[in-house]
Amino acid sequence: MLTVREHIDISAPVERVFDYMDTPAHQATITPSLSESVLLERLPNGGSRARYTYRLLGLSFSGEVRATDYVPNERIVWTMTGDLQGTIRWYAEPIETRCRFTYAATYRVPGPRFLQSLTGPLVRRYNEREIRTLLRNLKERLESPRAAG
C-alpha cells in the first residue's frame, strides 16, 4: 500500500471549499489525470457514489468511489474500487476566514506484485505531483475573482 498526503491553505470559507469538492464533476476540472468523474447517486449518509476514469503513465483506470464517512464542512472519506483500490480522505479545517484542505490517499500500486517494488517509487512521485497540482488548481479556482460569491 502507498500513502500520499498534502495540504494547502485557501482564502475561502470552509463551506465553499467543501461544497466545491463535494461535487464529483469538479474533480476532473482540477485533477490533471482524471478524465471523468460522474455522480452516480447521493447516498443516505449525504455523500456520493461516483464513477471515475483516471490516466496514469499512459494507462487508463476506471472504477467507483463511495463516500463511507461524510461530515459536512469537515471531511469525506472515500472507498475506491475498480482498477485502482484504496481510500481517499479529504479534510477541511477552518483557520480564521480561510480553509486548510488536506488530501490523503492510501492505495495499492497497480500492476503485478513482482513489479511493484520498481513501479512503487515512480507511482508515488507521480501521485505526489498530481495531488500538489490538484490542490494548487483548487486554490486558484476558489480564490479567483470569478469564484467570489
Annotate each PLM feature.
Residues 14-15, 42-45, 68-73, 91-100:
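A short, structured loop/turn motif at beta-sheet edges
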Residues 50-56, 75-82:
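Short beta-strand segments that buttress and anchor functional surface loops
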Residues 59-71, 76-79:
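Helix-adjacent hinge/juxtasegments
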Residues 79-133, 149:
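Beta-strand/loop substructures that line and gate deep hydrophobic ligand-binding cavities in soluble
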